[in-house]
Amino acid sequence: MWISGCWKAEGNVQAEEHWTKLEGQSMLGMGRTVVNGKTVFHEFLQIRERADGIYYIAQLNDEPPVSFKLVKLNPNQAIFENLQHDFPQRIIYGRVIDGSLFAAIEGVEKGKPKRIDFAMRRLRCD
C-alpha cells in the first residue's frame, strides 16, 4: 500500500507516522506527536485483514486498541470508519499527486462536527 514509509506533518505541532508493509494487506505503524521538542502523544498502528474485512487498529498511549473498518479504497484514498467510537469516527488517508500524503481524522465531538487535517511529506526512514 502507498502509505508504507515514513511521513511527517509540520506546523505548530509535528506529527510523524512510520509504516512497514507486511504480507497481504497487513501493515504495522507507529505514530507520534511532538510539541516543543517533546513527544506528547504516541500510538501503535496496524492495518490487518480479518474474516469480515480490513481494519485500521490504533492503540493510543496506554489505552486499549480501537478498530476502524475499511469502508472505501481506491488507488489514491483509504477511509476507515468506527461510528461507535467517541472521536475520531473516521480516519482518511489520501495519496497526493506530488508524492505527499494527506491524512485526516473526523467525526463528532461534544455534539459538533470536528475534522483535523495533516499534510505529510515523505521522510527518509532511519
How should each PLM-predicted stretch be described?
Residues 14, 88, 115:
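Short coil/loop residues immediately preceding or within conserved phosphate-binding loops
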Residues 75, 100-126:
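Edge beta-strand at a domain terminus
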Residues 1-4, 106-108:
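Short beta-strand segments and strand-loop junctions that repeat across beta-rich extracellular domains
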Residues 35, 53, 62, 86, ...:
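Residues that cap or initiate secondary-structure elements
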Residues 3, 9-10, 14-84:
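Central antiparallel beta-sheet cores of small beta-barrel/beta-sandwich binding domains
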